């Protein structure tokens, strides 16, 4: 029996800075234009007040060239001035080929991750295994982080969000004898 183990989050060398006003929604808006395989954004976003279940997300387009269908998605983030009930989770969804998503579609996969929220700040670092090939032929696959809350206040959220598709860096562990 062999296991694949991802030992650390390898953040991209370059990053994008985002300073914008965003309105959380049930169809969570995408924070920035998705890159291929990996992306880190420095976020300084002003959120508008919303009193319903809603969210924001940061995603990347998944590289489908690898013949294996299962890849690790490493995600990490640290944000301040967030709602006390905010949670973060990994998501995966598909859109038609060539379409750049501006919001998460109605159908998406959710993967739980380890999240720490102290009421004013949230941090997380985890890895999940996702299907990297589209389930519907001709679609593009996107995956990333969704930030979700029952109610958002008008505030400025600051921090870092990072998503990395790990498709080449895996260490194979053998069981002890």
From Swiss-Prot:
It is found in: Virion. InterPro entries: Capsid/spike_ssDNA_virus, Spike_G, Viral_coat. Pfam families: Phage_G. GO terms for biological process: symbiont entry into host cell; symbiont-mediated perturbation of host process; virion attachment to host cell. GO terms for cellular component: viral capsid. Keywords: Capsid protein, Host-virus interaction, Viral attachment to host cell, Viral genome ejection through host cell envelope, Viral penetration into host cytoplasm, Virion, Virus entry into host cell. Belongs to the microvirus G protein family. Attaches the circulating virion to the bacterial lipopolysaccharides which serve as receptor for the virus. Determines the phage host-range. Probably triggers with protein H the injection of the phage DNA into the host cytoplasm upon conformational changes induced by the interaction with host lipopolysaccharides. The virion is composed of 60 copies each of the F, G, and J proteins, and 12 copies of the H protein. There are 12 spikes which are each composed of 5 G and one H proteins. This is Major spike protein G. The lineage of its organism: Viruses, Monodnaviria, Sangervirae, Phixviricota, Malgrandaviricetes. The gene is G.
């Amino acid at each position: 029996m062999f296991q694949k183990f991802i030992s650390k989050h390898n953040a991209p060398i370059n990053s994008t800075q985002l300073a914008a006003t965003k309105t959380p929604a049930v169809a969570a808006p995408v924070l920035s234009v998705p890159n291929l395989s990996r992306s880190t954004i420095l976020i300084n976003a002003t959120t508008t007040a919303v009193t319903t279940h809603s969210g924001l997300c940061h995603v990347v387009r998944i590289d489908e060239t690898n013949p294996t269908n299962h890849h690790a998605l490493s995600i990490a983030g640290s944000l301040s001035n967030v709602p006390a009930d905010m949670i973060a989770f990994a998501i995966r969804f598909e859109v038609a080929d060539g379409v750049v998503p501006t919001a998460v579609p109605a159908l998406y996969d959710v993967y739980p991750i380890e999240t720490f929220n102290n009421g004013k700040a949230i941090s997380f670092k985890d890895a999940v295994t996702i299907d990297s090939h589209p389930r519907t032929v001709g679609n593009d696959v996107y995956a990333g982080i969704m930030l979700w809350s029952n109610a958002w206040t008008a505030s400025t959220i600051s921090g870092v969000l990072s998503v990395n598709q790990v498709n080449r860096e895996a260490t194979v562990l053998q069981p002890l004898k």
